[in-house]
């Protein structure tokens, strides 16, 4: 009876939101006329960019950004399911080669160099785009694969507005969404909240185990796959986002963004674990606070912006075992604290409609302490597990963009980076694009850049396994592509593109097992990552209020170790790097009528290897799969 009331209450709450959204949905479904790319923003000259529209971001507010990227882009999203670690990699690189920014501030974990996209609800993101390969140099350094750019917008409806949505899913999964906004001529204020929880307890057939069937003489006469329960996958995630924007109406804009995360997640046991799940506790907790304070001064042909930010992250991992009834022994009590201070200043100037100049400088100061409270931290003055380090990271760039004619554009970017006390060599990038046929908006793009990436703090200092002698990753990347867009207003729209990329990276960092029983990072002398990216979109409006929308993408991403053998027994040279799929694809189909929609999603990743030798062994090979 309680669940029935709960469901009815949810339907009553959701229905007004759905009904009020019908007009908005109809406007979204309208197919606009095709624009002429000669009027493209000069900031995007030569840039390989994938932008997600509001329909993709808000089609299901219960999704995380990991889900959005999986089914709407060509990047590789490695995920273990909802409320579990989800990372993103471009073009045959690793997740630590992907830079992520939120409202301009880089949010990669300085310990790991990567970002967990399962902790980013799409409900909190208003703008999202991907900058592929060399295009990331326009925004930041270190993105050997690319950049995921996330942000929020200050636009809210006038007056006071409130929204509440509740979702109910399988295995007693509940999602709560709330937003309160106030808008006036000068003030835009928004408060958003998301709370998701589930015991995530369900039955399944474990195909990774076999149970023997014996006769009376203890002879094996058969086998079967047991039915088990996922008893250690519960999660509770709370997100709060506060935004305040003020427009002086005299060219100045002030903004404050503050985002709080409180996550409590159990980590499921391996499907090959024959232990009793009730005898173990495997739990990860996280509390993160991110804030950005911004000021922008905007005039007709120039802009000046200043930002300051702060990130605090506390993470805990606990592994306990019940050694006797009601007697639990703590095996691991890992604790990490990260404090990051951020500052940035940028300027834009356009003296004429043919020229556009930018300058940018940013700083991140990281303070990290990592330890296991179950282990003595010092042995004769030397740490056994964990570390306590700080590092400052500086990045600056200048760019000049020139459009001699409407159909041709060129851009030069110069970037400089410093990590700790070490400066990177100058990072140059050149971009060019041109419209070769106004009919069909056929555009060619090409770019070349140098890129440079410093090791993460874990790469250098993590114990056991860190390698303080690691060299920095560096190399050159080349891009070329063609895109088109044709259509007829309110009838159909077809767009697509093909991009080729080629990267030669020296001293590539990869974590590999050692004979000492733990993993350790090392440099691979040379890696050649190359391939193609294909994307296409078709929207057809067969009748009034109807829309058929198809989005597809495909990536071919060989990432080959072309270095020298580390030993006579080394079989990794000439092989695909571990954990990197060579092929990936996604497809999303939508059939819409007014505010109703039927969706189909499909994603595919080819086989991956967990060993650098690419051996087809039980533990060294992951078969291809699709969702």
Question: Predicted segments — roles?
Answer:
Residues 159, 167, 182-283:
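Periplasmic-side early beta-strands and strand-to-turn transitions of outer-membrane beta-barrels
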Residues 22-58, 95:
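Short, acidic, small-residue-rich periplasmic hinge/interaction motif at the N-terminus
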Residues 403-407, 500-504, 523-613:
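Gram-negative outer-membrane beta-barrel transporters
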Residues 301-319, 437, 443-445, 472-530, ...:
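Membrane-embedded beta-barrel scaffold of Gram-negative outer-membrane proteins
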Residues 66-106:
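Extracytoplasmic beta-strand/coil segments of soluble accessory domains associated
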Residues 244-263, 282-423, 429-431, 435, ...:
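Face-selective signature of the C-terminal outer-membrane beta-barrel domain
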Residues 105-133, 464:
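Short acidic/polar hinge/loop motifs at secondary-structure boundaries
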Residues 65-68, 86-89, 101, 115-121, ...:
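N-terminal periplasmic accessory domains that precede
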């Amino acid at each position: 009876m309680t669940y029935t009331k709960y469901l009815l209450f949810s339907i009553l709450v959701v229905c007004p939101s759905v009904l009020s959204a019908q007009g908005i949905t109809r406007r979204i479904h309208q197919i606009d006329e095709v624009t002429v790319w000669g009027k493209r923003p000069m900031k995007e000259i030569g840039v390989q960019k994938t932008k997600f529209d509001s329909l993709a971001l808000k089609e299901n507010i219960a999704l995380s950004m990991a889900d959005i990227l999986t089914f709407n882009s060509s990047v590789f999203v490695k995920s273990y399911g909802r409320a579990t670690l989800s990372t993103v990699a471009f073009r045959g690189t690793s997740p630590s080669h992907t830079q992520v920014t939120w409202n301009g501030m880089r949010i990669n974990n300085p310990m790991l160099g990567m970002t967990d996209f399962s902790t980013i609800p799409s409900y909190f993101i208003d703008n999202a785009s991907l900058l592929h390969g060399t295009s990331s140099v326009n925004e930041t350094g270190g993105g050997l694969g690319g950049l995921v750019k996330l942000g929020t917008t200050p636009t809210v409806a006038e007056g006071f507005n409130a929204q509440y949505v509740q979702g109910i899913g399988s295995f007693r999964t509940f999602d709560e969404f709330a937003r309160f906004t106030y808008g006036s001529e000068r003030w835009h204020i928004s408060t958003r909240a998301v709370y998701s929880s589930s015991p995530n307890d369900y039955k399944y057939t474990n195909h990774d185990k076999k149970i023997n069937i014996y006769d009376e003489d203890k002879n094996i006469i058969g086998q079967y796959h047991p039915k088990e329960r996922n008893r250690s996958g519960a999660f509770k995630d709370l997100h709060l986002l506060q935004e305040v924007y003020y427009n002086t109406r005299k060219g100045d804009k002030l903004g404050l963004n503050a985002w709080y995360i409180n996550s409590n997640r159990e980590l499921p046991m391996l499907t090959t674990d024959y232990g009793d799940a009730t005898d173990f506790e495997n739990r990860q907790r996280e509390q993160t606070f991110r804030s950005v304070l911004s000021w922008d001064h905007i005039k007709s042909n120039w802009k000046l912006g200043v930002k300051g930010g702060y990130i605090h992250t506390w993470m805990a991992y606990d592994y306990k075992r019940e050694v006797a009834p009601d007697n639990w022994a703590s095996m691991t009590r890992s604790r990490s604290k990260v404090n990051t201070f951020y500052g940035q200043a940028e300027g834009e100037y356009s003296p004429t409609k043919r020229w556009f100049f930018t300058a940018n400088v940013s700083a991140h100061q990281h303070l990290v302490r990592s330890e296991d409270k179950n282990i003595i931290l010092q042995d004769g003055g030397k740490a056994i597990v964990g570390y306590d380090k700080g590092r400052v990271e500086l990045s600056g760039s200048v760019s000049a963009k020139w459009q001699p004619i409407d159909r041709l554009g060129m851009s030069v970017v110069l970037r400089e980076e410093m990590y700790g006390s070490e400066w990177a060599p100058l990072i140059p990038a050149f971009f060019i694009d041109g419209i070769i046929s106004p009919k069909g908006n056929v555009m060619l793009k090409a770019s070349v850049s140098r890129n440079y990436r410093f090791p993460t703090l874990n790469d250098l200092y993590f114990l056991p396994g860190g390698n303080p002698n690691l060299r920095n990753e560096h190399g050159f990347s080349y891009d070329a592509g063609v895109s088109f867009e044709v259509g007829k207003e309110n009838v159909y729209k077809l767009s697509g593109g093909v991009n080729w990329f080629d990267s030669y990276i020296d001293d590539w960092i990869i974590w590999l097992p050692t004979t000492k029983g733990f993993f350790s990072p090392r440099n691979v002398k040379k890696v050649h990552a190359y391939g193609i990216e294909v994307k296409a979109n078709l929207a057809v409006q067969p009748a009034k209020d109807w829309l058929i929308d198809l989005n597809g993408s495909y990536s071919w991403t060989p990432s080959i170790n072309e270095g020298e053998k580390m030993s006579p027994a080394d079989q990794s040279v000439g092989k695909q790097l571990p954990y990197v799929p060579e092929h990936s694809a996604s497809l999303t189909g939508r059939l819409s009528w007014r505010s109703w929609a039927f969706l189909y999603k499909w994603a595919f990743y080819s086989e991956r290897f967990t060993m650098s030798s690419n051996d087809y062994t039980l533990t060294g090979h992951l078969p291809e799969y699709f969702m």
